[in-house]
Amino acid sequence: MTSSPAPQPAPPPVPLLFPPLRDRAWPVRRPSPGLAIDLGSARTRVWLSGRGLIADAPTVTSPGPGGTRPVRRGGIVDAEGAARLLGRLLAGHLPRSGRRPVVVLTTPVGCGGDHRAAASATLEFLRPRTVLTIDSVRAVALGTGADLDEPLLVVDVGARLTEIALLAGGAVAAAHRTALGAADLGGSTTAAALAGSVVETVTGMLREDGTPRTLDALHRGLLLSGGGARRPDVVHHLARRLRTPVQPAPAPHTAAVRGAAAALLAARRHPALAPDPDDAHR
């Protein structure tokens, strides 16, 4: 049995992804349900339209000692197990209207076709009307209401994966990831070592960038999210080594799912995702 998640900040509004079509009258129908999903290595978080955050639970196929982890280092390694997990978390939450949901799923930066195929297989049981993906780092920026008019460095320290990205004009301009996370801290992996890997990555991004964007973003400061943002030692080492302000996101562990929810709300306002009259009969 999973405990009820604590109330989380509502996702901030974001602009429409496309301009509305005003010269056509659209029939008034109930919209399809919307789901925002952050499927992490350690925890899975689900946001449902009209309800908010409905699940914040360990990413295991089943509760108890027999459960296995279907996501490792950010990658889906067991699509069937991940589907069972989501089915368990969503039980009793989705409306019985027959309308197929619109889903926004966070994905690690730089993930390839294998990850997207696994994600598609995981969500197949939902019979989604549409599946939209959003890079976790961009979701973090949306979820915190960050100003995307200026270059921004986002560092998302998850349980087993750290993603570092430069956002420019609201899009991912450069990104890297490392297979280290907050759950690795302890023993031979220290907060200083984790921060050092981030510093090395940012330094490389500075060398590779032929524009002033990365340097401008570094002067602006880092936006830090994920479970690692709740570790004062990680924040301290990053700020000291990079000599720049490090701003932990509000409720950093749910920033990505809040951003996915913000993207979902914007997408559902577009006429292309207007309610499908045939959904109720499928």
Per-range role (PLM):
Residues 1-154, 171-222, 226-282:
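Nucleotide/phosphate-binding catalytic cleft detector across ATP-hydrolyzing
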Residues 151-157, 161-167:
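Basic (Lys/Arg-enriched) interaction patch that binds polyanionic ligands
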